Amino acid sequence: NMTVFRLNRDCTFPHPKHAESDGLLAVGGDLSAKRLINGYRDGIFPWYSEGDPILWWYTHPRFVIYPDRFTAGKRLMRYWKKTSYTFTIDQAFSQVIGLCGSSRTGRGEETWILPEMREAYGQLHELGYAHSVECWDVDRLVGGLYGVELGGVFFGESMFSTVSNSSKFCLIYLVEQARKRGVQLIDCQMTTRHLLQFGAVEISGEKFYQHLQLLIADIGPQPAWKI
């Protein structure tokens, strides 16, 4: 029984419990900051290909990392402690999102990070909701990730690396910062096998929704990520 909701001008969404088994919940609307934030509050995110209408998803079960249960293998942690790379936050957001898109097309994969998505998340970044982590080899950007932070939740969107381990290092760095900032949940959206090594777990759509109601209270603009 397939019901996909068509969104109208007001920025509300149907309840995530109406999502299809593949996660599809709604179609249409726009990528305004208000609509995106309303979506993320309930764990709903846009994901679509060029030429498609905007598709909104609530994937379930949900793949998440609890920062206080994060693990990384001994060998990786050894590399992490010895790395000469430097890490920053919010220093090159538009470069990071651009490279997340182009690294996929470079591998012959389709990218959902279309120009209008880059623009929309760039606006969320300017408003203090979207953040990037950068990995630098001196002054060359060699890895990064970006996502949206609301209250105690970081919604990971995408990552890229041009050298081995750099995106994994960005994840370790993100978790360290998340712990300092009181972020209690990192949403990985899809079940991605390589995240299992970091202690990522699958939880039900209901449990994820309950987490969000608890961790995202009335959101004002997020405080800046200070290092």
From Swiss-Prot:
- List, in alphabetical order, the Gene Ontology terms for molecular function in this entry: leucyl-tRNA--protein transferase activity
- The portions of this protein that span the membrane are none
Q: Say if the entry is tagged with keyword Acyltransferase.
A: yes
Q: Which residues form a coiled coil?
A: none
GO biological process, alphabetically ordered: protein catabolic process
Q: What class of enzyme is it?
A: transferase
| Short name of any one Pfam family annotated for the protein | Leu_Phe_trans
* InterPro entries, per the entry: Acyl_CoA_acyltransferase, Leu/Phe-tRNA_Trfase, Leu/Phe-tRNA_Trfase_C, Leu/Phe-tRNA_Trfase_N
User: Per the record, GO CC terms?
Assistant: cytoplasm
Report the domain of life of the source organism. Bacteria
Spell out the Gene3D superfamilies in the cross-references.
Leucyl/phenylalanyl-tRNA-protein transferase, C-terminal domain (3.40.630.70), Leucyl/phenylalanyl-tRNA-protein transferase, N-terminal domain (3.30.70.3550)
**What are the entry keywords?**
Acyltransferase, Cytoplasm, Transferase
Presence of keyword Cytoplasm? yes
Q: Which NCBIfam families does this entry report, sorted A to Z?
A: aat (TIGR00667)
Q: Which family does it belong to?
A: Belongs to the L/F-transferase family.
Q: What does this protein do?
A: Functions in the N-end rule pathway of protein degradation where it conjugates Leu, Phe and, less efficiently, Met from aminoacyl-tRNAs to the N-termini of proteins containing an N-terminal arginine or lysine.
| HAMAP family for the chain | Leu_Phe_trans (MF_00688)
Name of the protein: Leucyl/phenylalanyl-tRNA--protein transferase
Gene symbol of the encoding locus: aat
